[in-house]
Amino acid sequence: MSMANFTGGRNSCTFHEEFKQVLLPLVYSVVFLLGLPLNAVVIGQIWLARKALTRTTIYMLNLAMADLLYVCSLPLLIYNYTQKDYWPFGDFTCKFVRFQFYTNLHGSILFLTCISVQRYMGICHPLASWHKKKGKKLTWLVCAAVWFIVIAQCLPTFVFASTGTQRNRTVCYDLSPPDRSTSYFPYGITLTITGFLLPFAAILACYCSMARILCQKDELIGLAVHKKKDKAVRMIIIVVIVFSISFFPFHLTKTIYLIVRSSASLPCPTLQAFAIAYKCTRPFASMNSVLDPILFYFTQRKFRESTRYLLDKMSSKWRQDHCISYGS
């Protein structure tokens, strides 16, 4: 039986969390098995076409790198949850794995924001030249700034996340130990605002402006904008799916959970209900590591064409070998 002790304020509760032994290893295994090859292929594909990098593919490259680094840490979490929260890998590894999760989460959000702004400029301001003059150099500087901001945002994870002891077993706390829930609360809320709400507001503003242009009759928009219309629509749909599955449910349940676990008056069943809701959405926040490569595939025509060419070549090779084997 999997249980977690919670002690904060005047509350001392024992949570029953058997669901984590099934849900979290299952979702993390799917993310690992799909995310590792998909992001490796994206990075390899961009590397092969590095002489023809665009601003969007530079953002996609950084997005794939963040996803790949994160999925490499998932085997530790899969082992942890299959062993009923037992963490044998030490305190620093616990802190680093939690740091990996949040840097990937908020890095993905910011890089998707950059891609959305880039697409917004192409659709709503196709004749503007200020963002084109700097070209790739400006894009690389933006990526460096994103990494700096994300690392600075998530560094306090090394202070709050830590190992502890429950029922004579070492565990790795996700947010903070229960007795530090009150001190973690301001940081957790600030991270949600700066790492999710503000970028999400920027994306919504870009998409509303883009929708106004894309919904116009074709004869009212320029040829250059018309060519980008389908690509922009695909990107909007996929980014909305990523936010709907990965980001919004997680941040909503996390914020509510931070509020209730900092309270000194709520009964244990209420605390457990919100804890379960939060911990059920947490593994799905990792799904962006699978969805991001799909975004790359559906918004990059050259990548789709090269992928089809590779698959056709592999299929032809298989049919040829199969016919030879059958004939002999």
Swiss-Prot record:
Residues in the Extracellular compartment per record: 1-22, 79-96, 161-189, 253-275
Protein origin, superkingdom: Eukaryota
Glycosylation sites: 5
Function: Receptor for extracellular ADP > UTP > ATP = UDP. The activity of this receptor is mediated by G proteins which activate a phosphatidylinositol-calcium second messenger system.
Lineage: Eukaryota, Metazoa, Chordata, Craniata, Vertebrata
Protein name (database record): P2Y purinoceptor 3
Similarity annotation: Belongs to the G-protein coupled receptor 1 family.
Protein's cellular compartments: Cell membrane
Keyword field: Cell membrane, Disulfide bond, G-protein coupled receptor, Glycoprotein, Membrane, Receptor, Transducer, Transmembrane, Transmembrane helix
